[in-house]
Amino acid sequence: MDKMLFSFLRLCFVLLTVWTTWVAADFALYENYDEDALIAGLALSSTCLAALNTTVTCNETAVGLLGHGADIHFWTTTDVNNLCTTDCVSSLSSWKDNVATVCAEETTIQGNVVVKARALPLTFTYNSDLVCMQDSSSNWCFLDSQTWQGSDYIRWDPTMCFTNGDDNSTVALQCADPDFDIGDISDDMAALTNLYDKELFCNECFLNLYRQRLLDPWLPVTNFTDYLIDQFDLVQANCSTTLPYSTSASTLYVGTATATTTTSATTTTDSTTTATCLGQMVQPLQNWLTCNDLCDTYNISTGDARVITGDYACYFNQATCFPLPCEIDTVWDTPSCDELATRYSNSTYSVTTAQFLSWNTNVQGSCSGIAAGQRARREKSAPGGTFPKPNATITAPGATGEPTYYTAATAAYPTQTGTISECGDYYLVVAGDDCATVDLRFGLNYTQLQEYNTYLDATCSNLWLNYDICVAPVTAQTVSTDVVILIMAARLQMESVARILPETRPALVLSLELVVPYLVIVEAPVTTVLGQTAIAVLPYQS
C-alpha cells in the first residue's frame, strides 16, 4: 500500500497531459473533456466534477509544469514568476478547499488506484507551495535548491579488507571482527549533518523546503520516511531551529482498482472494476530485486519497471503486472536516441528514432544522452513482422489547444482491422488500459474513439494489448500565415532535465525524499545531485 501511495504521483496524471497548451490561459483540470464521459469514467457526481473543473486563475502552462511534480522540470525565474502570482496562489488554495467540501468522501480511480477525489488538487497545491516558497529576503528557495549538490551515504572503502599480495598491513583492523560487514552503514555515516556542510543544511531555504517535503500529502509510511523525520530533527537541533510539522495521514489512498468498489454521491449501486494482467504477473520477493536484477530476470526495460512499480528502486510489495518479456540491451556510454536507433538497425530493417521511442516509452534520461546502465528494449524483428517507417507528423495548435494533425502517421506497432487510414496519432495500448483510460488520456469520448477505431464493440471488450490505437484523425489543412507549425516524430523530448538511473554515474535525484534509499543499493561511489549540478563522491577512507 505504501508504494502504491508513493506511485500515485506518477500514475494518476495520465489524465492531465492536455495542460501543455500553445497560449497562456487560465487553468481548468478537465477543460477539454466531455462531461458525461467523465462522470461515467471517474464515477463522480456532477457536483464534485464541477468543483474539480473550476477555472483556476493561473497561467495554464505554468500550472501544467506542476502535474508530474515540481522536481521534474528545471525551473527558470520566468517560470516561477508566471506561476507564483498572488491571484494564482490564492485561486489554487480556494480550489483545493472547495473540492474538499463538495467532493467530501467520494472516490475515483486514477492509474489503477482508488483515491479520494479531494486528493486531485493536492499535487498542484503541494508542488506550488514548493516552487513559490521564498525566504525572508524574498529569494525563491526552489530556484536556489536547483544548484545544491547532494551526496551518497559515507561508505567503507570497498578494498579495505583486501591484502596487497602477501602484505597484510593494508587490511583495516575492522576486518578482523567476524561481525563486521563492509556494507553496513552506521547512523553517523547516514547522518545528513555529516553529508552536508552546516552552511547548507542550516540555510533558511534548505530547512523550509525540507519541512515542506515532509508535508507531502502522499508521503508513505515507511522506514525511509522515519529516517527523513529523524534527520530533520537532527538538522534542527544542529541549527537551533524549531519548525513545527506533521506528516499527512494515509487517508487519501483507498485501494487498488482490482475488485474495489467505487462510490459517488449520486451512485445507488456498487460498481466493481477488475483488472486482468495480459503480461507477466510477478510476485514480490522477501529479498526484493534491484531494478537491474528485476529487468534481467523478467526481460523488461528499466523505464517500464520504474513506472509500473512507481518506485525508483523498483520495489513492490504485492503481485504486479509487468509487460511480456522482450529482448533487452544494457545501454552504456550515454548514447543518444538517434545513436541507439542506428545501433539496433540491421541489414534488412532500418530502425528510426520514433520506433525506438515507441518500444521505450519510458526511456530514462534525455534523448541527447540517455542514462547509462539502464535496460532498453530492442527488437530483432519488428512487431507484426515489419519495421514501419513513420513519417514526421505535422501538428499545429487547434482551436482548443489540442494538436491538429495534417498528415497521416504510420503506426509503430500493429493495428487492428478497422483502424481508420487517415489517423494523425497513435497510442500503444499497455497493461491496465481500457477505453475509458484512453479516452481520458486524450480528451476523447467513446463515440470518437469508436469513430477512429471502428472495430471497437460497445463494451470495449476487444481492445488488444501491445497494439496501436488511433487517438486523433487527420484534419484537412487550411491556409494560414499566423500558425507556427512544429514537426514531431514520436513525442516531445525534455532536453533540459534527464531522469537518470541511480545505479550509474552521474545520477539525478529528483527530490529530497529520493536522496538516500536508492543509493544504498549502489556498490560503487556515485554522483548525485539535488538539483542539476553533479559532483563526484569519493568512498570513505578508513
Swiss-Prot record:
In plants, chitin acts as a microbe-associated molecular pattern (MAMP) that is recognized by lysin motif (LysM)-containing plant cell surface-localized pattern recognition receptors (PRRs) that activate a plethora of downstream immune responses. Belongs to the secreted LysM effector family. Keywords: Chitin-binding, Glycoprotein, Repeat, Signal, Virulence. Might have a role in sequestration of chitin oligosaccharides (breakdown products of fungal cell walls that are released during invasion and act as triggers of host immunity) to dampen host defense. Residues 1-24 form the signal peptide. InterPro entries: LysM1-like, LysM_dom, LysM_dom_sf. Disruption phenotype: Does not affect radial growth rate and colony morphology, nor lesion development on apples. This is Secreted LysM effector LysM4. Glycans are attached at residues 53, 59, 168, 223, 238, 299, 346, 391, 445. The LysM (lysin motif) domains are small globular domains involved in binding chitin in eukaryotes. LysM4 contains 2 LysM domains. It comes from Penicillium expansum (Blue mold rot fungus). Induction: Highly expressed during the infection and development of decay of apple fruit. It comes from the Eukaryota. GO terms for molecular function: chitin binding. Residues 327-378, 425-471 form the LysM domain.
